[in-house]
């Protein structure tokens, strides 16, 4: 499928600073795009634009050939966005968070206990998330990736706080998603340790 996700002439201004301008971007099914850049370069701002959570100062973003604004509901159903923050309900347990996502995003049934076990959270399923470590909270947050059917994933620093084993597990999950014709945009400060044949990188320059 061509024209899966395309951005044309994007500009983003924050606090009178031009983070980027005239930025073009294209993503096809099966592709992984890694956005790189120094702290403050505008990576999260770009991801938020691409997720439809904020509006560019100039340019447009098309999903399957149509502007995001005319298909907000379809785009939301096609997207799994996980931001900088974990996005979990800290008062709820891991099991309750999964039940919440399943209801909110109308996800099909799957075995939550087994999923959490495979993410190294066995025995912690019923602990309120506020009592979990940073890496464990991140694992709960990323559990969404094993549940969602959305073809487009936009992930802001998903490896933060994860140990090596969890990083490898997450990259295996990327492979499966890409093999199933999914697409991923990710920001990371470190190089991906596994080989991704479809990987492209984009560097955002820090501008004063
Ligand atoms: N909503 C906002 N209002 C005002 N300024 C903002 C807003 N969002 C981001 N900024 C500013 O835009 C700049 C880029 O922020 P952004 O979070 O996109 O950078 P980043 O490349 O993701 O950085 P990091 O690697 O530190 O996560 C920063 O200087 C930040 O202060």
Regions flagged by a language model, labelled:
Residues 51:
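Helix-to-loop junction immediately C-terminal to a conserved catalytic motif
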Residues 142, 181:
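Hydrophobic anchor residue at the start of the ABC signature
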